[in-house]
Amino acid sequence: MSEPKRSIMWFRRDLRIGDNPALLEAIAAGEEIVPVFILDKKLIESAGTKHLAYLGRSLRLLDESLNNSLHVMVGEQSEVLRELMKRYNAATVHISTEYEPYGTARDQRVEAAGIPLVRTGSPYAVAPGRVVKPSDATPYKVYTPFYRSWSIHGWRKPAETPKNIKCVKPNESDRNFPDWQLPEGASITAAGEKAALARWKHFQENGLDNYDEARNLAAIDGTSKLSAHLKWGEIHPRTLLAPLGESKAHDTFRKEIAWREFYADVLHNNPHTDKEYYAPRFAEMRYNQPDEKFQAWKDGKTGYPFVDAAMRQLVHEGWMHNRTRMVVASFLVKDLHLEWQLGADFFMEHLVDFDVASNAHGWQWTAGSGTDASPYYRVFNPIEQGKRFDAEGDYIRRYVPELAHLSATSIHEPWLHTDIDTNNYPPRIVDHAIERLESLDRLKEIKSDKPQDPRA
């Protein structure tokens, strides 16, 4: 009796069963599939502990969805895949296409080693490189026209969920599930496809219709909190886009998804910008060297309560509100005069939802050096941002308990209230008003008030 026809499904950033075109192709290509996740030593070495703990949980939950058939392998990718193809007589390896620099190079190496990769779908509603200017077919460098073309391009409806997946049962030696533990005291969001779908359902029922008004308020549950699920492909952006209507709130949410896709497109077309300045002249600016002030920023002890609350949330939960990401980034670059890469690396170390494109270009947007960037002369005021987006101080009280007893009128500027005990909360490490002017002076030195074309 001949062996059944088999195909390999190589999971990477698509840890789900539903709306997974690559998985459907793998199922269609054979009578049985060999599901595999290959632990990448290089990525593991650079990842933070919370990021890895989340991934470990997600892999076990994916395994449950595959009836305990997920191969979790350690080794060089082409060697692992070649061994599996030989062992199971599998003809094809199915993947979702990756577009980030590392993933692209990895897949090219695997193919160069003679492993046939069948690409179907990607982590995006519209794959990077597909949305181009109709006039000359070049990539967009500004978000707004990109968004218009992205919307016109459109996307497929969510793919069906397979009902009966026949998988090859792995050997025990192929079940190398990592035991990555959270740091003591840390707490992260629930992982897995089921948690992603449950969170999406909750957000649709409780937050989506008010998203345009609530998304910037740090103290409330006003955002989708789906970023980690999107990072690991536990839910696909198609699933989020499909039910959206034309209301202002729904359109605002759709635009936030488009920002993620825009940054992926920018990095795909400018792969060096994960570490380098998109606008090179900003590399010429005078920057300070990291010192104890940088450490205070990392520790959430800058003396600015809104900044400190955000940094403590990041370290404790591996997540931070998008509004506060911008505020702490501006503080690092424009109050402490440090290069954005230092902050981006710290985010990489702690964010559960770390995504190289969104992280690098989110930082460059705030720093003023990126495409479609916030002008460098725009400096977020950490005091006014707190008053505006945490007016009652509830967010600060949650993460800076030293100040929990302060009133809404005093919690944002505790240094003005010397008669109140602040439980050894640190004094300000810089004066924002002074450092804002210093940033503008340094900007004048490079004689630019906005980023220029990186190829100029």
Annotate each language-model stretch with its function.
Residues D221-E402, A408:
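Active-site-proximal binding-pocket segments
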